[in-house]
Amino acid sequence: MYLRKTQRVRRWISPCGFAACLSFTLLLTSGLPVHSQQSAESTKAAGMDGMRGTQAMPAMPMKGVLGEMKGAFGNWPASREGSGTSWQTDSGPMFMKMLPSVGGFDLSAMGTLQAGYVNAGGKRGDKGFSSNSMLMLMGRKGLGGGILGLHFMTSLDPIFNGPRGVPNLFQNGFTVHGVDVGDRKDPHNIFAEVAASYSHPLSKNFSGFLYGGPVGEPALGGAMYLHRTSGLNIPEAPISHDWFDGSHISFGVATLGLVYQNKWKLEGSLFNSDEPGVKLYGVGRFRLNSSSGRLSYNPSHDWSFSTSYGYLNSDVNQHRLTFSAAYSRALTQGDTLSATAYFGQNIVQGSPKSNAWLAEATYYHAKEAFFARYERVDKSELIDVPPGNYTVNKFLFGDVHNFYSKDQLDYGLGAYAGLYSYPSALNDVYGNNPITFGVFLRIQPGKS
């Protein structure tokens, strides 16, 4: 992530913040499954088509049982679809709440709201309140033999955290009001996605889709960390975020994709790689100044692979290369294991290549979600340290316990800790062996 400026906002929770939080709660608690018998029959027929390997796209494929829902981009389970147009595994758990249909659109909501206390540790680590939130609304309906999709995503981070974001040791630096800020994660924008899509079968084996809008995610990297079933319960952003899924909020996206046999997907995007932070409460200027391409492959229900390349033509021209593998497995007694591994490389002219590795997993067992994440990242954008490219290792682990469930919502309490290793040249700045720890409350739709 490059140094940037964010607009002036008040750091205390304004009346607008309370209204947004209230709307978040009311929206998730008001939705009830509203589907006719005809819709259920359409879904059953769609499932039979999928078993035969056809590309038929039913007009109204959703029904009350989330496991039988189809995606917005093709005739596959909705669980496959991550952020933007990315793929995950089919067998991953769904955390979704059905809403009443409106105007022929089947509506659903996903998301997470996390709020708590964090002490980042060491000489450089801040401590205090921390919030991490993302709310997604999706609508889809049959149109002209294909599927029209509407995609909206918002975050309360700017309201709760302010422009300085939250403590996140070894996160890349950014600038607020002309002041460099390091070891903190900048907030997501209020408008994180405002986009539409249309998918249509082209033949027995091929289907195609279009996706785009004023705010969206290009075909670069994989599913954003709050959308991955392996990472959505982890309350801290990866310090490798800018090597893999850092372009997930772009003010201008247009993507064209081709799918073969519901297993292979090739797509290309034009998008805006300018940093979106200067418009925390609005939408920036629509531009298509960068490009990317991605190849995805789902050989089975449990596996998903992808590789992508992007040219980011912003303040600093950058090339990005990514590889990823995701795995999910439904276990006995309703347990699920979800894991993701990825490699990302950023190349800036005149600078050495920088690499990032990540491996994370979450084990869903009864009311628990045990999580762990390991990262190894080459860092050259740390603030107020001697110039250089430093390899930083981070291991984070914790658990969330669901203590209450009502109206398809789970309320959980979590705790976590983070450990680090890095070159001794940073000891004077970061101290020896800093430890991060935090506690948090999490609200999200229940697992289905």
Where are these regions (language model features)?
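Transmembrane beta-strands of outer-membrane beta-barrel pores
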Residues: 113-121, 154-160, 214-218, 270-276, ...
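Residue-level signature of outer-membrane beta-barrel architecture
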Residues: 100, 105, 139-143, 200, ...
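Repeated loop/turn-to-beta-strand initiation elements of outer-membrane beta-barrel proteins
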Residues: 107, 144-149, 204-208, 218, ...
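N-terminal periplasmic/intermembrane-space "pro-region" immediately following the signal or transit peptide
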Residues: 32-112, 125-126, 139-145, 151, ...
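Detector for outer-membrane/organellar transmembrane beta-barrel domains
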Residues: 263-265, 269, 286, 294-385, ...
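Surface-exposed coil loops of outer-membrane beta-barrel proteins
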Residues: 162-296
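Outer-membrane beta-barrel "beta-signal"
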Residues: 397, 431-448
